[in-house]
Amino acid sequence: MDIVTLAEVAGNLNVVGYGLAAIGPGIGLGILIGKTIESTARQPELGGRLQTLMFLGLAFVEVLALLGFVAAFIFQ
């Protein structure tokens, strides 16, 4: 392998790393939204409060994806 090929492979590893970093928040969002819907079905009177807490949790989970995205550029 020449140096150009190695540089191309090393550049593509950042993309793979971000793809793996995005899996965790994706799974977290699915679990969070699913449990909120399940809880609202069990206790409809708490729907508004559960929705507020869900959006707060969504913000925290999305921060993980953004950190992975930023890290891909920083460690490039």
UniProtKB/Swiss-Prot annotation:
> Where is this gene product found?
Cell membrane
UniProt keyword annotations, A-Z: ATP synthesis, Cell membrane, CF(0), Hydrogen ion transport, Ion transport, Lipid-binding, Membrane, Transmembrane, Transmembrane helix, Transport
Gene3D superfamilies recorded for this chain?
A: F1F0 ATP synthase subunit C
Q: Where is this site: Reversibly protonated during proton transport?
A: 62
Membrane spanning residue stretches: 13-33, 55-75
For whether the record's keyword set contains Transmembrane helix, the answer is: yes
Where does the UniProt entry say this protein principally localizes? membrane
Give GO MF terms, alphabetically. Answer: lipid binding; proton-transporting ATP synthase activity, rotational mechanism
Q: Name one Pfam family in it.
A: ATP-synt_C
What kind of membrane protein is this, topologically? Multi-pass membrane protein
GO annotation, cellular component aspect: plasma membrane; proton-transporting ATP synthase complex; proton-transporting two-sector ATPase complex, proton-transporting domain
Assembly information from the UniProt record: F-type ATPases have 2 components, F(1) - the catalytic core - and F(0) - the membrane proton channel. F(1) has five subunits: alpha(3), beta(3), gamma(1), delta(1), epsilon(1). F(0) has three main subunits: a(1), b(2) and c(10-14). The alpha and beta chains form an alternating ring which encloses part of the gamma chain. F(1) is attached to F(0) by a central stalk formed by the gamma and epsilon chains, while a peripheral stalk is formed by the delta and b chains.
**Similarity field:** Belongs to the ATPase C chain family.
Its function, per the record, reads:
F(1)F(0) ATP synthase produces ATP from ADP in the presence of a proton or sodium gradient. F-type ATPases consist of two structural domains, F(1) containing the extramembraneous catalytic core and F(0) containing the membrane proton channel, linked together by a central stalk and a peripheral stalk. During catalysis, ATP synthesis in the catalytic domain of F(1) is coupled via a rotary mechanism of the central stalk subunits to proton translocation.
What is the protein name given in its UniProt record? ATP synthase subunit c
Q: Which organism is it from?
A: Bifidobacterium animalis subsp. lactis (strain AD011)
Point out the gene that encodes the protein: atpE
